[in-house]
Structures are given as C-alpha cells and as structure tokens.
C-alpha cells in the first residue's frame, strides 16, 4: 500500500482514538490561552495606563518567549511532574507576550479625543475603560489571542514528551516506527487543520469585532432606513 492508503486505513481503524487526541490537543491549547488571557489582558491594560511598567513586563515576557519549548517543558516537568498541567502552564507562559503586547498596543493607539469625549460626558475612569477603550481595542486584542492560539496548538504537539497526550503522540509513534510515515501524517494533518481552522475562526472574530466594520454596518443601516 502507498502512504495515502496506509493513512486512510489508519484513520478507519483508529478514528475514535484520533478524535479523542484531537479534542485533548485542542483543550490543552485553549486552556493555556484562556488562562493567559485572564492574566494578560488586565496586565496589558495596566501597563497601558502606567507605561513605566511596560519595559519590565515586556522584558520578562520576551525572555520567556526565547526559551525553547522542549526546555520549558523539561523544567516545568521537574516541578509539576508529567501530564497535561505541565503543558498548559507552558502554553500559559508562551501566550502572555502576544496577548499583553496586543492589549497594550490596542489601548495606547486609541485617539485621545475619544477619551476626552468620555470624560466630558462625566464617565469615571472605569467607565471610560469599559465603554470606550475596550470596545475600540477589542479587535487588536483578538489578534493577540489569535496569534497565541495558533502558537499554542503547535507547541502542544510536543507535549507528548511529558506524557500529556494529544496529536503529538501519533507523530512521535510514527517517528519511532520502521515505516511510520502514515502514522506521522495521521497526527500532523489534524494538527495543521486545527491550527488553520483556529486562525480562520479568530480572524473572522477579529473582523467582526473591528470598530471600523461596526461603524460601516451602522451607516448602512441608517442609509437603508432613510
């Protein structure tokens, strides 16, 4: 059998296993990015308002980003042991930089006139943040989440080395087999599909949440009503 036939046979015989590992892979990636968003978005907002802190925060997150993923997993494994939690923590650390950076960029790029208009209407600082800054910066923040999620999906593939499972299991198993090209592809193809699908979904959300698009949509509704 050629590689394509071997691949189809593998999927036919191990379809439920592949789907289980696909779900496990995605959940680890999503949890890592979600936890990073819970920390990274407030951190980005904070350093956007207290810019003296930005150099320190970016210095730390840039250093984290330079550590090879396998080395990070090895160090965290010594502390947390084997399993998915080690991978999720490493994804959390790697996702901080794109999320914090985009949140910071989105907030500081808002025109000062919008902020002054909010203050002139009697808004508190929290109301300006909630009703002016976050809506205008949301598409940029989503771009950071998009980058973080795609990176996380790739890093999760090597989580198999710390016993986390995921699609990387098939890639490693195929690498160790005598004629394992089909097994490698059985793990690599779903990983690529997941990354591309996540990127397209997040790109759509980014466009949907863009304030420019909302403004144009609102203008069309006004014109049609007129």
UniProtKB/Swiss-Prot annotation:
<feature type="transmembrane region" description="Helical">
    <location>
        <begin position="27"/>
        <end position="47"/>
    </location>
</feature>
<dbReference type="InterPro" id="IPR051204">
    <property type="entry name" value="ABC_transp_perm/SBD"/>
</dbReference>
<dbReference type="InterPro" id="IPR000515">
    <property type="entry name" value="MetI-like"/>
</dbReference>
<dbReference type="GO" id="GO:0006865">
    <property type="term" value="P:amino acid transport"/>
</dbReference>
<dbReference type="Pfam" id="PF00528">
    <property type="entry name" value="BPD_transp_1"/>
</dbReference>
<dbReference type="GO" id="GO:0055085">
    <property type="term" value="P:transmembrane transport"/>
</dbReference>
<feature type="transmembrane region" description="Helical">
    <location>
        <begin position="182"/>
        <end position="202"/>
    </location>
</feature>
<keyword id="KW-0029">Amino-acid transport</keyword>
<keyword id="KW-0813">Transport</keyword>
<comment type="similarity">
    <text>Belongs to the binding-protein-dependent transport system permease family. CysTW subfamily.</text>
</comment>
<feature type="domain" description="ABC transmembrane type-1">
    <location>
        <begin position="22"/>
        <end position="202"/>
    </location>
</feature>
<feature type="transmembrane region" description="Helical">
    <location>
        <begin position="73"/>
        <end position="93"/>
    </location>
</feature>
<keyword id="KW-0472">Membrane</keyword>
<dbReference type="InterPro" id="IPR035906">
    <property type="entry name" value="MetI-like_sf"/>
</dbReference>
<keyword id="KW-1133">Transmembrane helix</keyword>
<feature type="transmembrane region" description="Helical">
    <location>
        <begin position="52"/>
        <end position="72"/>
    </location>
</feature>
<feature type="transmembrane region" description="Helical">
    <location>
        <begin position="148"/>
        <end position="168"/>
    </location>
</feature>
<keyword id="KW-1003">Cell membrane</keyword>
<protein>
    <recommendedName>
        <fullName>Choline transport system permease protein OpuBD</fullName>
    </recommendedName>
</protein>
<keyword id="KW-0812">Transmembrane</keyword>
<comment type="function">
    <text>Involved in a high affinity multicomponent binding-protein-dependent transport system for choline; probably responsible for the translocation of the substrate across the membrane.</text>
</comment>
<dbReference type="GO" id="GO:0005886">
    <property type="term" value="C:plasma membrane"/>
</dbReference>
């Amino acid at each position: 059998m050629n590689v394509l036939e071997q691949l189809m046979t593998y999927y036919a015989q191990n379809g439920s296993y592949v789907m289980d590992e696909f779900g496990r892979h995605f959940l680890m990636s999503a949890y890592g990015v979600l936890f990073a968003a819970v920390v990274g978005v407030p951190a980005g907002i904070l350093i956007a308002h207290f810019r003296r802190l930005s150099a320190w925060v970016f210095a730390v997150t840039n250093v984290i980003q330079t550590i090879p993923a396998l080395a990070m997993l090895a160090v965290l494994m010594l502390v947390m042991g084997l399993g998915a939690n080690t991978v999720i923590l490493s994804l959390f650390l790697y996702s901080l930089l794109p999320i914090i950076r985009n949140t910071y960029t989105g907030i500081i790029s808002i025109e000062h006139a919008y902020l002054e208009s909010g203050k002139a209407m009697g808004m508190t600082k929290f109301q300006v943040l909630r009703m002016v800054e976050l809506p205008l910066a949301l598409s940029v923040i989503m771009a950071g989440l998009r980058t973080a999620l795609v990176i996380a999906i790739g890093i999760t593939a090597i989580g198999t080395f710390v016993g986390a499972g995921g699609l990387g299991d098939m890639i490693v198993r195929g690498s160790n087999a005598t004629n394992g090209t089909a097994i490698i592809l059985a793990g690599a193809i779903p990983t690529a599909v997941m990354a591309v699908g996540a990127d397209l979904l997040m790109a759509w959300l980014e466009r949907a949440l863009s304030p420019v698009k909302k403004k144009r949509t609102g203008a069309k509704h006004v014109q049609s009503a007129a």
